[in-house]
Design a protein with these regions (language model features):
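Glycine-rich flavin
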Residues: 21-118
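Flavin-dependent oxidoreductase catalytic core characteristic
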Residues: 1-25
Length: 118
């Protein structure tokens, strides 16, 4: 696996990095912590992630996703981690998508489009 970015991956990084830095600084995490938010993440921020198509980046196009690969997900995770962004991206957009893709069938048909749409 190459450790460099192609043009599409560089564009992804160039759009996600400033977005996360501006919309989800560490102070955002502290605010969620201090208010003891039950979800542990900002629904508004997740809605913005959805507008960018991030929840569905690993979801196959046949299920309404972007059909990207794990390298692209890694780029997003790197930026989320850099800013300590409280987000369900790893558990939902990576973990759940991998499990559902493996399960296939009606479960994948039901849940993958839902994940892709946020």
């Amino acid at each position: 696996m190459p450790l460099y970015h192609n043009d599409d991956q560089a564009m992804l990084k160039d759009s996600v990095a400033p977005f996360v830095a501006e919309q989800a600084p560490v102070s955002h995490l502290r605010k969620l912590r201090d208010t003891a938010d039950a979800t542990g993440f900002s629904r508004g921020l997740w809605a913005q992630f959805t507008e960018m198509g991030l929840p569905g980046m690993l979801v196959p196009e046949a299920h309404g996703g972007l059909g990207m690969g794990h390298m692209e997900a890694g780029i997003v995770l790197e930026e989320i981690g850099r800013n300590l962004t409280p987000s369900p991206f790893l558990s939902t957009s990576v973990g759940a998508v991998a499990a559902l893709a493996k399960a296939g069938g009606t479960q994948a048909g039901r849940w993958l489009p839902a994940i892709a749409s946020g």
